[in-house]
């Protein structure tokens, strides 16, 4: 494929992926990674490419959510610090830990949380207080799994916090804003392992420069739109959308894991 073709294709991928992530608080990494892998990009290149692109898209997304008052500063600070620590640690061990070993547990957890979200939204009285207990450990876990598996910050953190009864708009905005700092930590660590030669299978990431640029440009275009979208959509609609998205992602990953896809 030509450089221009790669840029245009992944520009569209970045636009769609960032809109999903900005509006629902998850799935940029999973969406972008799926297209990169399908295009024949090696897993190591895919993870690093997505995190490089997210340097820019998460900054734009976080700024958009902040401008629409979708961010709780206390929650943002806790998630940013904890997620960055967990993400950096995960990036440092990703060359020695097989992500496939923990993937079945992640899939099961996501499916469970998807059911919990739908149950809370459709069957119970909404609890609109933002969760404060256990946020730091959750952020560390989300950052760690995001680095290990190439995605997972949004599905793990957003899903868990909404599942506890938090207001989706504020949860999604705060988690998206914190993701910039998590991505910065993960991306920096991944690049360091590639440059120093510790990640033997990474190869020359510059081969994917056009795809990375496309992901960045597409994401920057859609970030403000998604930030506005989440600020006006009713809580029940947003919560149901998140729950269904989580179940869909879990089902897709389970099918891929068992060889059905």
Locate the predicted segments by residue.
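Transmembrane alpha-helices of multi-pass small-molecule transport proteins
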Residues: 49-64
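Hydrophobic alpha-helical segments of secondary membrane carriers
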Residues: 49-53, 174-178, 245
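Juxtamembrane transmembrane-helix boundary motif
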Residues: 1-23, 27-39, 43-44, 63-151, ...
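Hydrophobic alpha-helical transmembrane segments in multi-pass membrane proteins
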Residues: 53, 57, 182-187
